[in-house]
A protein has these predicted regions:
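Charge-rich amphipathic alpha-helical interaction elements
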Residues: 1-122
């Protein structure tokens, strides 16, 4: 009976390790996406600075195009900020889930050790 319990604990351990690996991959993917967003935001800010540094006399059509472009850049920056906030929230959720899984794994390993000691005891 102890052997069966130990086998069950080992299967659970494998499942927990698989889940932890998957969570690690998801976190890595989120970090990569966050780096991409940060890079894109920097590009947009650079474009914004270039556009706002234009000097000289502009006609109505040129000014309208500039305003439209700046408005588009602003909405894109806002969209990226919202996406980054969502990524940060998801990272927090995954980190919490990962911590829970690590706790479960530690408990499982401790229980396995106890079962092994009971099995070896005369």
């Amino acid at each position: 009976m102890l052997r069966q319990l130990l086998d069950i604990k080992r299967r659970r351990e494998r499942g927990l390790r698989t889940t932890l690996a998957r969570l690690g991959e998801e976190l890595q993917s989120l970090r990569l996406r966050q780096q991409q967003l940060t890079s894109r935001q920097a590009e947009l800010h650079q474009q914004w600075r270039q556009l706002t540094q234009q000097a000289g006399c502009m006609n109505q059509a040129t000014l309208s195009r500039l305003r439209a472009t700046l408005c588009t850049l602003e909405s894109e920056v806002e969209r990226l900020a919202h996406e980054q906030d969502a990524l940060i929230a998801e990272q927090g959720r995954l980190n919490q889930l990962r911590a829970e899984q690590e706790t479960r794994l530690r408990l499982n390993l401790r229980e396995q050790e106890k079962l092994q000691l009971l099995e070896e005891a005369p």
